[in-house]
UniProtKB/Swiss-Prot annotation:
Role: Involved in the biosynthesis of the carotenoids spheroidene and spirilloxanthin.
Region listing for Disordered, in residue ranges: 1-26
Family per similarity comment: Belongs to the CrtA family.
Protein name: Spheroidene monooxygenase
Reaction(s) catalysed (UniProt annotation): spheroidene + 4 reduced [2Fe-2S]-[ferredoxin] + 2 O2 + 4 H(+) = spheroiden-2-one + 4 oxidized [2Fe-2S]-[ferredoxin] + 3 H2O; spirilloxanthin + 4 reduced [2Fe-2S]-[ferredoxin] + 2 O2 + 4 H(+) = 2-oxospirilloxanthin + 4 oxidized [2Fe-2S]-[ferredoxin] + 3 H2O; 2-oxospirilloxanthin + 4 reduced [2Fe-2S]-[ferredoxin] + 2 O2 + 4 H(+) = 2,2'-dioxospirilloxanthin + 4 oxidized [2Fe-2S]-[ferredoxin] + 3 H2O; spheroidene + 2 reduced [2Fe-2S]-[ferredoxin] + O2 + 2 H(+) = 2-hydroxyspheroidene + 2 oxidized [2Fe-2S]-[ferredoxin] + H2O
Cofactor(s) recorded in Swiss-Prot or TrEMBL: heme
Pathway info: Carotenoid biosynthesis; spheroidene biosynthesis; Carotenoid biosynthesis; spirilloxanthin biosynthesis
Transmembrane portions of the chain: none
Organism: Rubrivivax gelatinosus
Keyword Iron-sulfur appears in the UniProt entry: no
Leading EC class: oxidoreductase
Gene: crtA
EC number annotated for this UniProt entry: 1.14.15.9
């Protein structure tokens, strides 16, 4: 998504290599608010039919989990990237829980998550709590329940429904900004996600700090994309999170 970081900023006050991310001393949080669990999977070759079946099943299995209040089954761009070419094996499951206890039970004891583990070539699980949010996703708004972090890692989500009449203008402007995101200093994880080809897209990224994320938001490619993106979206949502835990492997990099 082209205008992820500047809009997310406005929502607040204005042997793979290992990641340094650690949740041994998670940030302090206030009671209440949603907790996100994001599953990122690269489906094993022997489990391709199971992987395709995730889109047939949709969000029904996830919404049957205790405490789950909103869910989206998502595809990704090729190799987890941001282009128009879809990936045949990489996908995501986005689930919002009413509290952290429900999120932890889902990660630790859910048969759905265990099924993901059994069928994965790679699996990365992110747990995070929003500290600022603007906009909606299919009419749903995130409940904020965490203070803004003083330091440490942050995550950002942007999603949008692209107006069909503007898709031909959106995608040429999206490419340079999104390609630069993966290479940006301080970006630990970045993935392009989507509900529907071309028109319902999202980006999720994790950063070393707010400063690193804001520095990327001021880069030339990103700023040009922001200017070009006006009036592209019929609905959008921009969220910043405090990451509570990241564990697993994504695109060859180990987290946790």
């Amino acid at each position: 998504m082209t205008n992820e970081l500047s809009n997310a900023a406005g929502a607040s006050q204005q042997g793979p290599a290992a990641s340094s991310f650690s949740a041994d001393t998670p940030p302090r949080t206030t009671a209440g608010g949603d907790v996100l669990v994001l599953l990122l999977i690269d489906v094993a070759p022997a489990a391709r039919l199971w992987g395709y079946g995730r889109f047939v099943a949709g969000t029904t299995p996830a919404l049957g989990e205790p405490g789950a209040r909103f869910a989206k089954q998502l595809g990704t761009g090729y190799e987890g990237g941001f282009g128009l070419r879809p990936s045949a094996t990489r996908q995501g499951l986005f689930v919002l829980f009413e509290d952290e206890a429900a999120a932890d039970a889902f990660i630790g004891r859910s048969e759905l998550v265990q099924t993901y583990r059994r069928n994965a070539r790679e699996l990365c699980i992110v747990k995070a709590r929003p500290y600022s949010a603007r906009g909606s996703w299919d009419g749903q708004k995130l409940r904020v329940g965490s203070p803004a972090p003083v330091d440490g890692p942050v995550a950002a989500l942007t999603r949008a429904s692209i107006r069909p009449s503007q898709a031909h203008r959106f995608w040429p402007n999206a490419g340079p900004s999104q390609d630069s995101l993966e290479r940006a200093a301080g970006c630990r994880l970045a993935v392009g996600l989507g509900e529907a080809p071309f028109l319902r897209q999202a980006t999720f990224s994790v950063w070393d700090s707010v400063a690193a994320m804001d520095a990327y938001a001021r880069t030339g490619a990103h700023q040009r994309a922001i200017v070009a993106s006006r009036d592209f979206f019929s609905e959008s949502m921009f969220v910043r999170f405090v990451p509570l835990s990241i564990e697993g492997v994504w695109k060859g990099r180990r987290y946790g």
